[in-house]
A protein has these predicted regions:
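Long, compositionally biased non-active-site segments enriched in small/hydrophobic residues and glycine
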Residues: 1-153
């Protein structure tokens, strides 16, 4: 959003009804995990980004928690308390998320003939995409994810 023109200046207050709102979607559920409102429920019921002006300043951030919650809840026709608890306690990283893409880029690095780096990448290749403390590569994956994504979480 360019800030060098008066186009972006507020001249009046936006009516409450004009703000993005998702009420009683057909899916029966909403997710709020500090994510953009375009990813709050099943894809068929989400708000459409193009329906809202970029001048509203709506953050576009999509967290792993939002991606995972939507991915896990979307196929459920009914959500039991046990299923909701499993979603809440999920330790996985969504394949569409930035963390998994970052790990994929790390795995593509040339180790430059360094056996220590080659060994670390072999271990990282075994990562199952979760941080449940069960996999041998969990700690390494956590350390790799933590630093570049520290400003998001």
């Amino acid at each position: 959003l360019p800030g060098n023109t008066s186009r972006a200046l507020w001249r009046k207050q936006l009516p409450f009804e004009a703000a993005p709102q998702l009420v009683s979607p057909a899916s029966g559920w909403l997710v709020n995990a500090n994510n953009a409102p375009w990813l709050a429920t099943d894809a068929t019921a989400n708000l459409r980004r193009g329906a809202y002006s970029p001048l509203l300043g709506i953050e576009e951030n999509v967290t792993n928690r939002a991606l995972r919650s939507v991915a896990l809840l979307s196929p459920m026709r009914r959500i039991s308390s046990e299923a909701l608890w499993r979603v809440k306690m999920d330790t996985g990283y969504d394949s569409a998320g930035g963390e998994r893409r970052y790990i994929a880029r790390v795995l593509a690095l040339d180790t430059g003939g360094r056996p220590d780096l080659a060994q670390a990448l072999r271990l990282l290749r075994s990562w199952d995409g979760t941080l449940d403390g069960r996999g041998a590569a969990d700690a390494l994956a956590f350390l790799l994810i933590k630093y570049p994504f520290r400003n998001i979480y």
